[in-house]
Regions:
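AMP-forming adenylation/ATP pyrophosphatase catalytic core
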Residues: 34, 114-121, 125-362
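ATP-dependent adenylation/nucleotidyltransferase module used to activate substrates
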Residues: 1-146, 166-167, 357-361
Length: 362
């Protein structure tokens, strides 16, 4: 974000720096004595303020901890309790971060907002604004931005999207911030910096561990394989950390919160041919034609799978041309036309290949 601000400043924009405070470290991980890390630590605030002072533009801290906690963190907890796997970064970008930035931009009479995300904003000849992948495919973040509405995209500038990460690091060095160029990237959830989301849930939900401990692991025939530590502490596709020895690799294929049950199977049991997606936000077009082809990504690092899209109720039915593995309800499905984002939504449920369905219900 600092490099994005300096790039725009160099191009002649009148820049106002904003650093967002989204969460309280101590409230999330407790007083562990560990150094505060992640996007909201004191060092990141100081780095941003130093750059602003040195280049002569104002800098403010925007405290959105209350809004972030009320929506993003609560949604994170509720989704796991519902047996789904949330994506808090998508929720934050869609519902909190951009809206808060735009509100402050309006108060400061700013025309645009800008962030350090690796993606591009373009306008189609139909007048609609849409996202395009950043040219550095290894750093592209368009997947996490699918929820941005037209009024936000029309006033968003993403200057890093047409550069590779190594070029941005070189720019940071050229701007006089060699330490910024050397900074390691943070991949953990900002409010779970120790990457222990299970511990986070236990701290936030009183009595959760006692309430869900001792449910059954079962296979796809319903046979009980053992007991688990509680369904919210597992995700579809998980293999490691199951704490059960079956003498063969086992994967979480389904989570049933109503009965505190976790279904285990072989890797092939993760294959899915269809999924239902709701909460759709269209970007490039204002909708789809029935059977429209798209490359659908089901997770951030996913390369995407060719699919056809069909409307159903108030959502989209995605039919994959080949089986896809590890589709997790609660995650985002993002539809691409080449490098362009058509739209996206939240995965509700999946359909297994017919052969597996037949086996399950005979």
């Amino acid at each position: 974000s600092t490099v994005a601000a300096l790039m725009l400043h160099k191009e002649g924009y009148e820049v106002v720096g904003i650093t967002m405070k989204t969460w309280d470290y101590a409230a999330s991980v407790g007083t562990t004595g560990k150094k505060e890390t992640g996007c909201c630590n004191l060092d990141s605030f100081n780095d941003a303020r130093q750059a602003a002072v040195q280049h002569g533009f104002p800098h403010f801290i925007l405290d959105i901890r209350e809004e972030f906690g009320d929506f993003v963190i609560e949604n994170f907890i509720e989704e796991y309790i519902a047996g789904r796997t949330p994506n808090p970064c998508v929720m934050c970008n869609t519902h909190i971060k951009w809206r808060a930035l735009m509100k402050r931009a309006d108060a400061l009479n700013c025309d645009f907002i800008s962030t350090g995300h690796y993606a591009q904003v373009h306008q189609h000849n139909n007048g609609r604004y849409f996202l395009r992948k950043g040219i550095d495919d290894t750093k592209d973040q368009s997947y996490a931005l699918w929820g941005l509405q037209q009024d936000l995209l029309s006033r968003t500038i993403l200057p890093l999207g047409t550069y590779h990460k190594k070029d941005i690091r070189q720019m940071a060095h050229d701007f006089g911030y060699p330490e910024l160029a050397k900074k390691n990237e943070s991949y953990e959830i900002c409010f779970v910096p120790d990457n222990d989301y299970r511990g986070f849930l236990k701290r936030k939900v009183a009595g959760l561990e006692e309430r869900v401990n001792g449910g059954n692991f079962i296979d796809k025939t319903g046979k009980i394989l053992g007991q688990h530590k509680g369904y919210p502490f597992y995700t579809v596709g998980q293999r490691k950390g199951l704490d059960i020895a079956l003498g063969r690799p086992a994967f979480v294929t389904e989570i049933v919160p109503e009965t505190n049950t976790v279904v285990l199977g072989e890797e092939a049991d993760l294959n899915r041919t269809e999924m239902k997606v709701k909460g759709i936000n269209w970007l490039k077009y204002d909708g789809i034609t029935e059977g429209m082809e798209a490359t659908t990504k089901i997770r951030y690092k996913d390369k995407g799978a060719l699919s056809s899209l069909y409307t159903y109720e108030n959502g989209i039915n995605v039919r994959f041309y080949t089986d896809v593995k590890g589709v997790a309800p609660g995650q985002s499905a993002v539809f691409y036309e080449g490098d362009d984002v058509i739209g996206g939504g939240i995965i509700q449920r999946t359909e297994q290949p017919f052969s597996i369905q037949l086996y399950l219900y005979l």
